[in-house]
């Protein structure tokens, strides 16, 4: 009797294993370089990754994708975006938490993606500096959309973006929306207000 049950369980497990989807292969690392205590990985598909924080196994691409290096290899991390709850406020998983930016959970800590990208590819922010999303979309954490500015510049750029959105809405012209304006043009607009 016991033997039959054991054999049945083995068969059931084998059937379950057949139904499981095959795992996607991990990206293969072509080479790794360490310079200034910061690791740089190049994948076979041409993507270059940099380590944001030394000692933490998070690697970032210029496109804002986050990978973690584990014992099993390099794995893409899930970036969590905040959803609007019934009250129209942004929240994570329906629970308000005051967190506005996309983040990654890694080893029981939350890391904002835009901060990790600037740490990996630009430099750490100094006293009185902030990270500016050029097109005003905080969910867009690509390196091309991020820059380090002073608090005053960030405030002025936010005012300009609000005005552009308002005029686009009033004139019903989507080409005036900051999300549709090329970044080179936005940077020229912002260059006029720099301190």
Regions found by a protein language model. Give the residues of each.
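Conserved recognition-core residues within compact binding domains
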Residues: 2-5, 9-130, 137-190
């Amino acid at each position: 009797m016991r033997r039959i049950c054991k054999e049945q369980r083995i068969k059931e497990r084998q059937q379950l294993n057949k139904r499981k989807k095959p795992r996607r292969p991990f990206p293969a690392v072509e080479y790794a370089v360490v310079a200034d205590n910061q690791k740089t990985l190049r994948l076979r598909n041409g993507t270059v990754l940099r380590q944001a924080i030394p000692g933490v196994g998070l690697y970032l691409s210029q496109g804002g994708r986050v990978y973690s290096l584990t014992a099993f290899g390099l794995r893409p991390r899930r970036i969590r975006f905040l959803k609007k709850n019934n009250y129209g406020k942004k929240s994570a998983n329906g629970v308000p938490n005051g967190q506005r930016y996309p983040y990654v959970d890694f080893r029981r800590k939350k890391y904002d993606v835009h901060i990790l990208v600037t740490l990996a590819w630009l430099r750490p922010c100094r006293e009185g500096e902030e990270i500016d999303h050029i097109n005003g979309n905080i969910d867009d954490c690509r390196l091309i959309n991020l820059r380090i500015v002073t608090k005053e510049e960030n405030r002025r750029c936010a005012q300009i973006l609000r005005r552009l959105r308002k005029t686009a809405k009033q004139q019903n012209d989507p080409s005036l929306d900051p999300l549709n304006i090329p970044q080179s043009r936005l940077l020229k607009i912002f260059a006029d207000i720099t301190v």
